[in-house]
Amino acid sequence: MLAPVAAILLLCAAAPPATPRPPSFSAGLDMVNVTVTVRDAHGKLVTDLQPDDFIVKEDGRPQVVEVFARAHEPGQDEVLTLDLGMLLDTSTSMLEQLKLSQEAATRFLEAVPRARELITIFFDHEIRVSKYDSENQQGLYDRIHAAKGGGDTALYDAMAVYLSRVEGTSGRKVLVMFTDGDDSRSELMLPEVIQLLRSSRVAVYPICFPSFAPGSTRAVKARAVLQSFADMTGGAIFNPSQSRELAAIYQKILDELGAQYVLGYVSDNQKTDGKLRRLVVDLPNRKDLKVRHRTSYIVKPREEGSAPAR
């Protein structure tokens, strides 16, 4: 799996590399941070929960929560800091939707709160990476609107490039994707991308622009793939059909980012065997609430002198 990823990264060598940041681990112990969104039965975000309200289980075993932070409160900057990634599909299948997608991307950037880092990836059969800080967005707007459509779709490869660039960074990592969900070009296969997502702490928010006949096999499959990315990472999927729907979608994403909790624990399983670990976050005394979070993670085998990624 690593060889295709390395080949993809070579295509993007001209782009400036993201600066690695050490995770917020202490005393040699490895913290697992889980970002959690909580809503009530009416879909309203719940922001007043306390640490004792939560139970975090890994492979069925309760863990001791040592870090608790709310996005709407000051402090805990290291675990709450936002790194934003944006994937913009410019392939042939998106030609009819490209203008709407470009409008969606720029409107989202105008609305998003200040992020520590902003990485934008344009992709068709090629992958083009741009990195801007939040003080220099005009150049990014110009590039978005200058993007031309054409070529096959390397969605999975583009995701792999983004995931590699934020590997090892602390804080919350959010990937917003403007795409129809189809992939016709990638070297990576879907199971490999899923493996990469499980090894990351990236929440995926696909904004899906269907470019195939409604109900067709291709359309159903593409949407199902995007839905799976959102579900497994604790993100959410949106399906706008008109530009007037975009503002409400952005507000939902931004409201969610501003209402999240981060729960951190040191796993009672200190093996670095590369095996999948299942996560469950429960509110035993608030069964009326719905909790969303990443559902699993993989601990990469530890390299000598380094901490494993979680």
State each model region's role.
Residues 14-310:
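Scaffold/interface architecture of coatomer-like assemblies
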Residues 2-13:
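Bacterial N-terminal signal peptides
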